[in-house]
Regions:
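Short, glycine/charged-enriched secondary-structure capping and boundary segments
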Residues: 53-55, 83-84, 117-120, 153-156, ...
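Helical hinge/lid and interdomain linker segments adjacent to catalytic or ligand-binding clefts
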Residues: 85, 89-93, 115
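Amide-donor transfer/coupling interface in amidating biosynthetic enzymes
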Residues: 1-74, 89, 95, 99, ...
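N-terminal beta-loop-helix "entrance" segment that forms/cooperates
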Residues: 73-86
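Cysteine-nucleophile active-site neighborhood
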Residues: 105-174
Length: 305
């Protein structure tokens, strides 16, 4: 949260140069506080796990949050109890008249398909368009990032020769960006995907900015519309054992997967994972909630446009 200090204090300018968030008294006195309304469009197969992963991160701030879990209609979800979906989820039609301060669209296990062949693609296109007029800031994760970039900007995804799985070293390209306040020079992020977007394609679109990348796993975070759209190709939200579960799942299916890169201690699955991304995952989501949601959203949620 910001430090509230007098605007004439000499430290103000120095703190701003260091990318420390300060809020001057005049602005602080005019701020109203209400619970933030966040919606999650959960397209992952193991919905309970994804709910827990995301809630672990978005609850780690002083901000009060009201959450709606959302699904597209017309798709049969086979890996989550129907009773759970009926009790805790809403359809897009249930919420499309609402405005939200923040919106998270998760990944989905459909990377090998063309976007147009995904059965809920037409509705997802409607949701992407809706988010531009009903949400202050939207995070798109993994497949959702590829889908959003394709829908809004025509950027095509490219299927990888083999699955990218592991925990990779990343760097910030835009150090003054509030999304990275408190980040180390090098930080780690899990990736688990079969497709990618390419840097050269993104650089052709003036409205897009690559703000973080990895020498091994490629483009990580792309931003548009001053942070109203954030595209994240990795899985910072993953729990310590998620990549391990995916690896053993693929083994049991006879898929002969590679051991996730830089994930296990000494690259040995028997020794378990070395968790190196937890603190930066928390920073990423708390910075998003503070600087791109709380600080930008209108007090009257009906004023979001």
């Amino acid at each position: 949260m910001p430090v509230r200090i007098p605007s004439t204090l000499p430290a103000v300018e120095e703190l701003k140069k260091e990318n420390i968030f300060v809020i001057e008294e005049q602005r602080a006195s005019s701020q109203d506080i209400r619970p933030l309304r966040i919606a999650v469009l959960n397209l992952m197969p193991l919905k309970l796990m994804t709910e827990t992963d995301l809630l672990r991160l978005i609850s780690n701030t002083p901000l009060q949050i009201e959450l709606d879990l959302v699904l597209p209609e017309g798709h049969e979800w086979t890996n989550t109890p129907k009773e759970h979906l009926e009790e805790f989820y809403k359809s897009f039609n249930d919420i499309k008249k609402n405005n939200y301060d923040g919106f998270i669209v998760t990944g989905a296990p459909v990377e090998m398909q063309d976007f147009e062949t995904v059965d809920y693609w037409p509705q997802l296109q409607e949701i992407f368009d809706w988010s531009r007029t009903h949400v202050t800031s939207t995070i798109h994760i993994c497949w959702a990032a590829l889908a959003g970039l394709y829908h809004h900007y025509g950027i095509r995804k490219h299927v990888l020769a083999e699955k990218l799985s592991g925990v990779f070293e990343h760097r910030v390209l835009e150090k003054s960006n509030p999304l990275f306040r408190g980040f180390d020079d090098v930080f780690y992020v899990p990736h688990s995907r079969h497709s990618e977007v390419r840097k050269e394609d993104i650089l052709k679109v003036p409205d897009l900015s690559i703000v973080s990348e990895s020498a091994e796993s490629g483009v990580y975070i792309i931003m548009a519309r001053n942070g109203r759209e954030i595209y994240i190709t990795g899985h910072s939200e993953y729990s310590p054992l998620t990549l391990d579960c995916e690896y053993h799942r693929d083994l049991s299916r006879g898929m002969n997967p590679h051991v996730p890169t830089h994930y296990y201690i000494d690259d040995n699955p028997a020794k378990g994972p070395l968790v190196r991304w937890r603190s930066h995952a928390n920073l990423l989501f708390s910075n998003w909630l503070n600087y791109f949601v709380y600080q930008e959203t209108p007090y009257d949620i009906r004023d979001i446009k």
